[in-house]
Amino acid sequence: VIILPANMATKIVKIEKNLESIQVAKAGDNVVLHFENNIDISRGDSVVLYHELPTESTQINSWISWLDNTPLQVGKTYLLQHRFKNVRVKIQEVNQKWNINDWEFTNETEIKLNDIAQISLRTNQPLFYDAFDKNPKSGNAILIDETSNNTVGALMFL
């Protein structure tokens, strides 16, 4: 396995659940992992199979569902919460907007309450993520307005 974001390779030598050794754990299980070389990991770190590494990037394309009365502002910095990690992001552009009335895509760039659009954003530090259609649990995030602390968008990474 690989531990991210430290990018350290190791092997799992023991899995414990309720103080008992088990052979298999699934996502969401509360377990203790013992690693071959005694690596210390923290909340928010990921343990992934070496052949299933997520994308690591500061440039992300995503679908967004806008949840706030104040329209999305291109160029504005927001807080992106992905799993247990928060990073600052800047909205770079609106690539296309989905018109839910006729199911067509438009080049309209104003994104208001309940609009759905494809956007490009840039994070202030690398983010490890999957495309939503590959792994919904690590392919989603929320966008938070830093001033109001309101959740303003729901994201599905492409």
Where are these regions (language model features)?
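C-terminal effector/interaction modules appended to NTPase cores
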Residues: 1-158
